[in-house]
């Protein structure tokens, strides 16, 4: 990955059709909307995108679609390692990074359970970062 440019990076929602499927035409409209407002990039796969309600396969498919249709010059930032275990988090993060995104954002609360110490969080975060 590279250093992303300074600028505006709004979070992107995931639009759905009336029958609760991902609305890919809606995603195209959102990409155009962001383009014409001059944003520097979008945070495409994030909590605003309903990542905890989508399967890994759905999140990855959406991200690949966004990467294939993003406006020229627009940076794409993503997240989405929602699994409880670290090995699956690594697999998920690696798959998102391999789409060619410009930056990946870790979800810090996925690295330790609520009753675990800060030391566990830091150890797990370093482990995942080193694996990527």
Q: What are these model-derived regions, one by one?
A:
Residues 2-132:
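Active-site beta->alpha loop and helix N-cap motifs at the rims of alpha/beta catalytic domains
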């Amino acid at each position: 990955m590279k250093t992303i440019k300074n600028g505006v990076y709004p979070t992107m929602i995931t639009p759905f059709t009336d029958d609760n499927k991902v609305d890919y035409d809606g995603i195209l409209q959102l990409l155009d909307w962001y383009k014409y407002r001059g944003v520097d990039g979008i945070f495409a796969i994030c909590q605003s995108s309903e990542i905890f309600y989508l399967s890994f396969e759905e999140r990855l498919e959406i991200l690949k679609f966004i990467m294939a249709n993003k406006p020229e010059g627009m940076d794409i930032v993503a997240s989405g390692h929602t699994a409880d275990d670290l090995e699956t988090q690594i697999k998920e993060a690696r798959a998102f990074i391999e789409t060619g995104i410009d930056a990946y954002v870790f979800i810090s609360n996925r690295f330790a359970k609520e009753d675990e110490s800060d030391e566990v969080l830091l150890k797990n975060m370093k482990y995942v970062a080193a694996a990527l």
